A protein has these predicted regions:
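Acidic low-complexity segments
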Residues: 88-189
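Beta-strand-rich, non-transmembrane domain signature
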Residues: 1-93
Length: 189
């Protein structure tokens, strides 16, 4: 618990760092879907000097330095990146970014001393009232497989009477959090 894996300078207070994105759960194991399952969540592309994104929020520029103990294919990031500059230019050749999930992969694997500067936006977190008023969006997700019938029945029982998609999502999140099945991984979850 006390090992330093990553040092980040100049990130706005309260910002989170995304270490990985797992969007597929088979009931036992979280995993990353491939491009045949969900086009939105598996679109990693090499990027040049800038990354197009439409995120609104607090702009930042932060320096990341990988310390001992972090050797992974995921490149830690914060918010929605608009550019990533590596201390060593050849390191940029192994950088891939997904604008839909605001996440990055680094096939050469991170290693101690890897240093990069991310410029981007920490998206504004909507209020509970704004979420409740929101309609559901349509996104491409992996097909849920082997889901017991009781899951659909429980979801309908919890959220079926809500008039907006946001209200339904909040009702589901609240009930699952109360039962210990849901967390954003943040303090207080």
């Amino acid at each position: 618990k006390d090992d330093v894996l990553l040092t980040v300078d100049d990130l706005p207070a309260g910002s989170t760092v995304r270490l990985a994105v797992m969007d597929r759960f088979d009931g036992n194991v979280w995993n990353l879907s491939d491009s045949t399952m969900a086009s939105d969540s598996s679109n990693y592309h090499r990027v040049g000097d800038s990354i197009a994104n439409n995120a609104a929020g607090k702009r930042f520029t932060a320096k990341f330095t990988v310390d001992d103990g972090l050797s992974d294919y995921w490149l830690p990031m914060a918010g929605a990146a608009s550019s990533v500059k590596f201390a060593t230019s050849s390191d940029a050749d192994s950088f891939y970014y997904n604008t839909d999930t605001m996440s990055a992969i680094y096939p050469s694997r991170t290693s101690p001393g890897l240093s990069y500067t991310e410029t981007g936006v920490i998206p504004r977190t909507p209020t509970d009232k704004e979420i409740a008023k929101a309609n559901a969006s349509s996104i491409s997700q992996p097909k849920a497989e082997d889901v017991p019938d009781c899951v659909d029945k429980l979801a309908t029982a919890i959220a079926g009477g809500q008039s907006k998609g946001g209200e339904a999502a909040q009702a589901l999140a609240d009930k699952l959090r109360e039962s210990g099945w849901f967390s954003h991984g943040l303090n207080g979850d």
